Amino acid sequence: MKLLVVGGGGREHAIIKSLKKNPNVTEIFALPGNGGIAADAVCVPIGATEIDKIVAFAQEQKIDYAVVAPDDPLVLGCVDALEASKIPCFGPRARAAIIEGSKVFSKNLMKKYGIPTAQYEVFDDMAAALAYLDTAPIPTVIKADGLALGKGVIIAQTRDEAKAAVRDMMENHVFGKSGDHVVIEEFLTGPEVSVLAFTDGKVVKPMVSSMDHKRAGDGDTGLNTGGMGTVAPNPYYTPAIAQRCMEEIFLPTVAAMNSEDRTFQGCLYFGLMLTPDGPKVIEYNCRFGDPETQVVLPLLESDLLTVMQATTNGTLADTEVRFSDKYACCVITASAGYPVSYQKGYEITMTPEAAAHTYVAGAKLEGGKLLTSGGRVTGTTAVADSLADAIQEAYRLASGVQFENAYRRSDIGQRALQA
């Protein structure tokens, strides 16, 4: 089988390494891929949002199955375009991807169908939003409606911070059109849990839960990032809570999308907060999370391609999705200065042992050398019989990934160990 994976980050590298385990897979193309993915797939310089070119390439190569991993092409209808060309693929169509593509849509969906989430108000007028903030409870959360590279959510500790965030989005257009509408919602407290789930629009098969570490600095300080590391499973996500989430959140979400004629097939990501009042949805994503994928897929014992195809074919109920009962930890190695400004173009060296456990994100091949080209450069994952061992081993392996100005948080997983 010839496969195509759209995307070029650490998440895509993890997906490709997992898909390669299927003996029927003969070739994998990554569009655009990256310098590290090139070791495991044929990288083609077509951007993830160049949908016409992606479809033309898939037809030319007679691709048997495609996986669209990032949010942008999903929201833009990449799956729709591939399916129209008779290429089966994994991922939601554009009508369903709106669950991530519009925060206003997802909040209104939850309100309409009684799915637990934070109280909120929606604004398309800046003056009205600023007036509301004069009396809103503080801290509060300001969210841009559209996609913003995971950076469109501001937790404001003061009224001035909240108003500045609204002005940035609605007046200064820091997220372009994504900030034309904003959601202002109540600040929830409690442990956060990420749950990725396969769904064919009928049944939901959750993957192992995980815990992300979003802040740049140790002790959860500094700016929000795309994620500096993950552990799985999440110790706060007990079997009782998992059952409650299935009944109150997962199945009702899939049913709600069906009712809206927006059937969701693919990977649905639930960002949850375990509040004193029970689990609530902070956000939905219409795809595998990054870096959650880098801990979840190494624990998957079932064949990924088989599960993906069952999701596409509507036969997920008859397909086993089994995970190991071990623990995984992923440590991100980033360029110093991320997520603000950082230098690029440094040579990356990896010990063979580190390379075998590392997913490459921000790197390019130039003259046979692997060079840094992004903020988050690599993610190194270890699997072990205990969480403490997985963390220790992930750091040991990650120390084998080296480049100038490399930066790692030193406390990935510590919060989970204290749970």
Listing of model-derived features with the role each one plays in the protein:
Residues 310-419:
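Peripheral (often C-terminal) accessory segments that flank ATP-dependent C-N-forming ligase machineries
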Residues 152-291:
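Internal nucleotide-binding/catalytic subdomain
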Residues 246-268, 285-353:
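Active-site "cap" helix and flanking loop/linker of ATP-utilizing ligase/carboxylase catalytic domains
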Residues 43-49, 121-125, 156:
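Short acidic-hydrophobic, aromatic-tinged amphipathic segments that line or gate anion-handling sites
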